[in-house]
């Protein structure tokens, strides 16, 4: 009380008021604030008053030898006065101008190489086109984006080793360069930066920009690839956007885009094979994207997309803990639930077994074109706040949330039977059945959901069953917001497991991903994707299957040749022949196969009748389950180029053409590789193989009935005669031998005799 009284007395004197309002601030705390520590507290102000001085810069004494005291205009460039407290010289800003104009020059050859990312950015901006500015509300949502165009995808540790090896090769410290990309980059950079005079630290910083992906969590409306992010400040504000087309693409965006396409193709293909997981792994390991192994890219690339994450899970890599449903990424932000199987009845009285989530939970839902916040209890949607680019996108999000809520009125809104199947013709699980049903038509769902009056909340508006906005009424529990919902920012990755049907689960057993979640969108990859796996041959159509099948046979000929003679059944069952079957007319598959297998068996039985070209040509046809029949074929049909084309059993055709002189095979005009024939082949034809154990008597003799097929000869009794159809439709008369001993000589004499009989 005493002190307050004293202060009151002081304040009543006019002098006190004057001192407090007029005198300068020299309070110790203020002085301390602006003078303690090395950190500049007001850099802009400091710069202004420094630059107003005559000599704001200090430099090493050597500058006095390198720069004249005055410039051409007679202005002083440096002062002889020493800088207080150091033995440096005080220098004028004019000295910098003089140095830039008259100072020593150095080789500039390394600048574009070291500052490559900057030079490339300038080129992209120079060739980019900026369109009109539109003023409109921007729904931005924070997404994790790549802010560094043109980088390789090395991990921080891998990049560090490369940088040390390139910039400080003589420094001590263990560096292990293991991956192909590390070795390639190191070699390339060492060559580029020979005799480089740029400060090593600067080179190291710039290399880091080139090698490592840098991501930030930024508010974005629109394109998220790095060439758009680098101009984010030019293309979108709070209430405006400017159209922009980048003036060039960068490899990292192309890798991301191509990786997604490859992963989607592989997952779709694996789903329909007998063992999806094994097939998926085989394809991932044998695929290259832009010349780099897909598995290497998967290990380094942080892209989060359903198909990519399924491939990562299969390889045992960690993935994000969020889960996917209906093309939206769900992340639980609070609450918890237990799962229980429950049977429910649809509006069509079909029984569905669904896994019900019991308990209160909140989720964020993020899709490409819409985002939402969802609060739900057991089989009840409490609140959905959704925002999106347009009516359509908002409707998609609402359908997914309604199905996810598992509400009874949603299940009762089903009209008709649910029998959706996946690519492998297996029924989808009940939740995806419901989703597909309402994605096709959600009218009944929206009509039955119910509406309610709404309060006037800033930035929120109602939406009616016909998806029109409304200020008074809205679908029960559902509101549309002007603000987007941010993507989940954490980069945390969790250990997951995957079953053979490619369902990915977290350690609690929750399904995070399944092939049903993989988008059906088709795109054209920016980088070349090379699928070496036979399962992916059909992706480029029938011609590619044909060429690839024959290329594979030629590449593996040594192995195939042995199997052909020792274990043909195993050979016929090879998965590499699977795609080929789709080219053979369904009705003819079994007959062709039986015919070719018989032919091959005869070749095996008779010495000197092995024919490399013919085995290669006919082998794919033998893979189908065979049918024993008396059919003989002089040509086999394959469906390519939109119609049936013929492969001649003997001789060349546009489909299969072997050039004896060059020993090269062309399939549909494309080179399929070179063949090495066995030295002893090519003398005896298949005819001799056909006639093991028969004596050729001469030309056809009508008295012995119609010509038999090769298969039917086995029914003849010893000594019986018959006409037989051989080769290119020629018929000769034969007699079955009475003894077996002379079988081998038949094959040698048969060739000569047939020629005589035909001629």
From Swiss-Prot:
Q: Which Pfam families match?
A: Flu_PB2_1st, Flu_PB2_2nd, Flu_PB2_3rd, Flu_PB2_4th, Flu_PB2_5th, Flu_PB2_6th, Flu_PB2_7th
Sequence motif Nuclear localization signal, location on chain = 736-739
What molecular function terms (GO) are annotated for this protein? Answer: RNA binding; RNA-directed RNA polymerase activity
Q: Which Gene3D superfamilies match?
A: Polymerase Basic Protein 2, C-terminal domain
List, alphabetically, the GO terms of the cellular component aspect: host cell nucleus; virion component
Q: Could you say which protein family the record assigns here? A: Belongs to the influenza viruses PB2 family.
Marked site, Avian adaptation, at 627
State the protein's purpose. Plays an essential role in transcription initiation and cap-stealing mechanism, in which cellular capped pre-mRNAs are used to generate primers for viral transcription. Recognizes and binds the 7-methylguanosine-containing cap of the target pre-RNA which is subsequently cleaved after 10-13 nucleotides by the viral protein PA. Plays a role in the initiation of the viral genome replication and modulates the activity of the ribonucleoprotein (RNP) complex.
GO BP annotations of the record are: 7-methylguanosine mRNA capping; cap snatching; DNA-templated transcription; symbiont-mediated suppression of host gene expression; symbiont-mediated suppression of host mRNA transcription via inhibition of RNA polymerase II activity; viral RNA genome replication
**Organism of this sequence:** Influenza A virus (strain A/Gull/Maryland/704/1977 H13N6)
Main localization is virion
Q: Which UniProt keywords apply?
A: Cap snatching, Eukaryotic host gene expression shutoff by virus, Eukaryotic host transcription shutoff by virus, Host gene expression shutoff by virus, Host nucleus, Host-virus interaction, Inhibition of host RNA polymerase II by virus, mRNA capping, mRNA processing, Viral transcription, Virion
Please give the subunit comment from the record.
Influenza RNA polymerase is composed of three subunits: PB1, PB2 and PA. Interacts (via N-terminus) with PB1 (via C-terminus). Interacts with nucleoprotein NP (via N-terminus).
Any idea what this protein is called?
Polymerase basic protein 2
Where is it localised? Virion; Host nucleus
């Amino acid at each position: 009380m005493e002190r307050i009284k004293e202060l009151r007395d002081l304040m009543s004197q006019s002098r006190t008021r004057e001192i407090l309002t007029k005198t300068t601030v020299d309070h110790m705390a203020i002085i301390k604030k602006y003078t303690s520590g090395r950190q500049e507290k007001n850099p802009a102000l400091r710069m202004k008053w420094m630059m107003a001085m005559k000599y704001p810069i200090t430099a090493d004494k050597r500058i006095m030898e390198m720069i004249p005291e005055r410039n051409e205009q007679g202005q002083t460039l440096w002062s002889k006065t020493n800088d207080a407290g150091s033995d440096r010289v005080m220098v004028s800003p004019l000295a910098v101008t003089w140095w830039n104009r008259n100072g020593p020059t150095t080789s500039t050859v390394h600048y574009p190489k070291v500052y490559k990312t900057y030079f490339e950015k300038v080129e992209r901006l120079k060739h980019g086109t900026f369109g009109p500015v539109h003023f409109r509300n921007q729904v931005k949502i924070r997404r994790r984006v790549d802010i560094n165009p043109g980088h390789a995808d090395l991990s921080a540790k891998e990049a560090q080793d490369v940088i040390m090896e390139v910039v400080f090769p003589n420094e001590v410290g263990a560096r292990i360069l293991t991956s192909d990309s590390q070795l390639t980059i190191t070699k390339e950079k060492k060559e580029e930066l020979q005799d480089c005079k740029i400060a090593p630290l600067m080179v190291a910083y710039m290399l880091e920009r080139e090698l490592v992906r840098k991501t930030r969590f930024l508010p974005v409306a629109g394109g998220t690839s790095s060439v758009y992010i680098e101009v984010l400040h030019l293309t979108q504000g709070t209430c405006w956007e400017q159209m922009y087309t980048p003036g060039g693409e960068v490899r990292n965006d192309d890798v991301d885009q191509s990786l997604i396409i490859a992963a989607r193709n592989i997952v779709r293909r694996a789903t329909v094979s007998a063992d999806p997981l094994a097939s998926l792994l085989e394809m991932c390991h044998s695929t290259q994207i832009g010349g780099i192994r897909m598995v290497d890219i998967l290990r380094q690339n942080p892209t989060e997309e359903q198909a990519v994450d399924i491939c990562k899970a299969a390889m045992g890599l960690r993935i994000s803990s969020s889960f996917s449903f209906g093309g939206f990424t769900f992340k639980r932000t609070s609450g918890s639930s237990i799962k229980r199987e429950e049977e429910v009845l649809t509006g069509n009285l079909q029984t569905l077994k669904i896994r019900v989530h019991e308990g209160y939970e909140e989720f964020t839902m993020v899709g490409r074109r819409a985002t939402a916040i969802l609060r739900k209890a057991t089989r009840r949607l409490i609140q959905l706040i959704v925002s999106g680019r347009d009516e359509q996108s908002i409707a998609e999000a609402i359908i997914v949330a309604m199905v996810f809520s598992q509400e009874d009125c949603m299940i009762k809104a089903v009209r008709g039977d649910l029998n959706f199947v996946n690519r492998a013709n297996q029924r989808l699980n009940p939740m995806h059945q419901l989703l597909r049903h309402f994605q096709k038509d959600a009218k009944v769902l929206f009509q039955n959901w119910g509406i309610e009056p709404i309060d006037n909340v800033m930035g929120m508006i109602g939406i009616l069953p016909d998806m029109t906005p409304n200020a008074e009424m809205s679908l029960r529990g559902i509101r549309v917001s002007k603000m987007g919902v941010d993507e989940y920012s954490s980069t945390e990755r969790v250990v997951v497991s995957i079953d053979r049907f490619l369902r990915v689960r977290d350690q609690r057993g929750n399904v995070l991903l399944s092939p049903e979640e993989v988008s059906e969108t088709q795109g054209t990859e920016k980088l070349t994707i090379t699928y070496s796996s036979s399962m992916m041959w059909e992706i480029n159509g029938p011609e590619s299957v044909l060429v690839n099948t024959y290329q594979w046979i030629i590449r593996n000929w040594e192995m195939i040749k042995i199997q052909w003679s020792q274990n043909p059944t195993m050979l016929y069952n090879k998965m590499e022949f699977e795609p080929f079957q789709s080219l053979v007319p369904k009705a003819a598959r079994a007959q062709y196969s039986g015919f070719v297998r018989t032919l091959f068996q005869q070749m095996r039985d008779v010495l000197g009748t092995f024919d490399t070209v013919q085995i290669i040509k006919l082998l794919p046809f033998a893979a189908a389950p065979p049918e024993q029949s008396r059919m003989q074929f002089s040509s086999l049909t394959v469906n390519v180029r939109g119609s049936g084309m013929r492969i001649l059993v003997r001789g060349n055709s546009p489909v299969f053409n072997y050039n004896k002189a060059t020993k090269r095979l062309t399939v549909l005009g494309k080179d399929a590789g070179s063949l090495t024939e066995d030295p002893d082949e090519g003398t005896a034809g298949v005819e001799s193989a056909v006639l093991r154990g028969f004596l050729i008597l001469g030309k056809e003799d009508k008295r012995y009935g119609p010509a038999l097929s090769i298969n039917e000869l086995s029914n003849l009794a010893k000594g019986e005669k018959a006409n037989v159809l051989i080769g290119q439709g020629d018929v000769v008369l034969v007699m079955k031998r009475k003894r077996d001993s002379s079988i081998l000589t038949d094959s040698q004499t048969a060739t000569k005799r047939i020629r005589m009989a035909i001629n």
